[in-house]
Amino acid sequence: MNITAEEAKQIMDSEEGYIILDARTQEEYDEGHIPGAIVISHEEITEKAEEVLTDKDQLILVYCRSGRRSKIAAEALLELGYTNIKEFGGIIDWPYEVE
């Protein structure tokens, strides 16, 4: 379930069909996020996940600011029946491009 930022970047560069999930607030997302990420705050994940993330077997890469909220979101997704969740911590440790 936990991977490094480097492993997440490698997946983003070499695979297709994954989702990057930003578990921060919309305001934080608007200030800067990993390219291609969608935002569902960790507080809204149980209400919005099944509407937005329709394939429970799709690879979902989850991050937040420091890693705490991404862990909460990843655990919530697993409890909802999602099977392919990779949590890679916080954007503060992301050494790659943001937008």
Task: Kindly label every feature range from the protein language model.
Residues 1-18, 26-59, 65-99:
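Rhodanese-like catalytic fold shared by cysteine-dependent sulfurtransferases
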Residues 21:
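Active-site flanking residues adjacent to catalytic metal/cofactor-binding acidic residues
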